[in-house]
């Protein structure tokens, strides 16, 4: 059986279109996109509401989830890095997580494994 990976990327919201364009170039077209909040090196920021300061330490991010066969793993990672970084990259440009994927099942056809991706 061909090995599969589950790629999770956290990126800046304004870089989503660029990441999608890069993924389309390598024919990766099936992905899940979610709006999430979090913080890392950016640490968030202070907000003032009704004369009170609040630590708004959660920043808006985009979470992209993609299941790929091993042959698509490195091109997928490079596409995400290229799109998310832009021309020079910033603190908070994102992170990519790669996890082993044991199985995939397409509910409609009952296909499993790499064919279901």
From Swiss-Prot:
Gene Ontology MF terms in the entry: ATP binding; enzyme regulator activity
Cellular component aspect of the GO annotation: cytosol
Induction (free text): Expressed under nitrogen-limiting conditions.
Gene3D superfamilies, per the entry: 3.30.70.120
Presence of keyword Cytoplasm: yes
One GO BP annotation of this record: regulation of nitrogen utilization
Disulphide bond pairs: none
UniProt: ADP binding residues: 32, 40-42, 92-95
KW Cytoplasm (keyword) present: yes
Keywords: ATP-binding, Cytoplasm, Nucleotide-binding
Stored PROSITE patterns: PII_GLNB_DOM
Activity regulation note: Inhibitory effects on GlnA1 are abolished in the presence of the effector 2-oxoglutarate.
Disruption phenotype: Disruption mutant exhibits a partial growth defect under nitrogen limitation when molecular nitrogen is used as the sole nitrogen source.
Binding-site list for ATP: 32, 40-42, 92-95
Top-rank lineage group of the source organism: Archaea
Listed Pfam families: P-II
The protein's role, per its UniProt record: Involved in the regulation of nitrogen metabolism. Regulates the activity of its targets by protein-protein interaction in response to the nitrogen status of the cell. Allows finetuning control of the glutamine synthetase GlnA1 under changing nitrogen availabilities via direct protein interaction.
UniProt miscellaneous comment: Unlike the enteric GlnK proteins, Glnk1 is not covalently modified by uridylylation under nitrogen limitation.
UniProt family annotation: Belongs to the P(II) protein family.
Subunit structure: Homotrimer. Interacts and forms stable complexes with the glutamine synthetase GlnA1.
The name this protein goes by in its record: Nitrogen regulatory protein GlnK1
Lineage summary: Archaea, Methanobacteriati, Methanobacteriota, Stenosarchaea group, Methanomicrobia
């Amino acid at each position: 059986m061909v090995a599969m990976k589950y790629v999770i990327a956290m990126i800046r919201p304004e870089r989503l279109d660029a990441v999608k364009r890069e993924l389309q170039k390598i024919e990766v077209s099936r992905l899940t996109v979610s709006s999430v909040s979090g913080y890392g090196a950016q640490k968030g920021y202070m907000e003032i509401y009704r004369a009170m300061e609040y630590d708004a330490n959660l920043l808006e991010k985009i979470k992209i989830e993609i299941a790929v066969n091993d042959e698509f793993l490195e091109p997928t990672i490079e596409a995400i890095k290229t799109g998310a970084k832009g021309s020079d990259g910033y603190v908070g440009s994102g992170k990519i997580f790669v996890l082993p994927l044991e199985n995939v099942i397409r509910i409609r056809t009952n296909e499993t494994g790499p064919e279901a991706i």
